[in-house]
Amino acid sequence: MTKVLVLYYSSYGHIETMAQAVAEGARSVPGTEVAVKRVPELVPEEVARNAGMKLDQPAPVATVAELAEYDAIIVGSPTRFGRMTSQMANFLDQTGGLWAKGALNGKVGAAFTSTASQHGGQETTLFSILTNLLHHGMVVVGLPYSYEGLSGVEQVKGGTPYGASTIADGDGSRRPTEVELGGARYQGALVARTAAKLRG
């Protein structure tokens, strides 16, 4: 059984929705067990509520130690000035012990994101996540152009060869489209298939 973790942080629900699509794609691959977990919130609850952040997310909170139990880890975070959120960075910064043991060497890693605008730093945010995974010796999987939704200019949409993505708009009113969710599913399935091949 190939074990896949979809690990995410979501402020307003966009990445939470994308995480579910990624998990759906991974589950479509026979012999795959998928867990969806989030990283801890760092914003005080009162501040988060006043900002309208989505706090009722059912996914359990992950621990750093459990990362070593998975064959693949797909990390999702919205952008903050062109990089991952402090919540996700704080979590990944605690993985030094795993790095020292080589606990994630050879496992599959991937990333997905959301931005407020079409040019809001999707690729740099993905790179900020992927850099961490590469330092752990993980085999990185993106979202290749074999996913047809990456091509075409008929609509404003997320999606890059470095990972699935969505555009939220400045007020968060835009929700992930079917093309963007399709990219998330495609990437999730590709990660699961790749991890299964590496496990032999």
UniProtKB/Swiss-Prot annotation:
Binds 1 FMN per monomer. It catalyses: a quinone + NADH + H(+) = a quinol + NAD(+); a quinone + NADPH + H(+) = a quinol + NADP(+). FMN binds at residues 10-15, 79-81, 114-120, 135. Pfam families: FMN_red (PF03358). One of its GO terms (molecular function) is NADP binding. It is an enzyme of class 1 (oxidoreductase). Its cofactor is FMN. Residues 4-191 form the Flavodoxin-like domain. Substrate binds at W99. GO terms for cellular component: membrane. Keywords: Flavoprotein, FMN, NAD, NADP, Nucleotide-binding, Oxidoreductase. Its EC number is 1.6.5.2. InterPro entries: Flavodoxin/NO_synth (IPR008254), Flavoprotein-like_sf (IPR029039), Flavoprotein_WrbA-like (IPR010089), FMN_Rdtase-like_dom (IPR005025), NQO (IPR037513). NAD(+) binds at Y12. Belongs to the WrbA family. NCBIfam families: flav_wrbA, PRK03767.1. This is NAD(P)H dehydrogenase (quinone). The lineage of its organism: Bacteria, Pseudomonadati, Pseudomonadota, Alphaproteobacteria, Rhodospirillales.
